[in-house]
Amino acid sequence: MNKTLALRTVVVSLLGTVMPDGAKTYYQQAQKDHPKIYAVYTLDLIDLTDGRYTYELEINVMDYGTDTSTIEDLADSIQKAFDKKVQLTEDVGVYFYIDRRNTVEEEDRSSLRRRLTFSTYLYER
């Protein structure tokens, strides 16, 4: 398995442990018929040094309405699931560390969005 696919598999697996029933996870862009609550993640390779691939993992969590408790709880769960997490698979070792968590203001005021970014270090095994 290539390293990017292996990393994406790890990310989807971790998100799957915290996403509520009926919520979806997308890579790069959500589908038009997405559910009310969903997450979109992206991976950007930012460095390669001595066999260590450094990625920035960005996870955007979306909800709709005026009550922010659901999206804040989900962002808390994602942060807990990823921060300082070590995942070892047959192909890669992956380490996650939180960099930033912030609210993103959307033009549509009924949209609620939280962005979490993680420094992600991948080693091929």
What are the language-model segments listed below?
Residues H34-L43:
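A short, hydrophobic beta-strand-centered structural micro-motif
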Residues T25-D33:
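Short acidic low-complexity segments
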Residues M1-A23, T42-R125:
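Charged, amphipathic alpha-helical segments and their flanking helix caps
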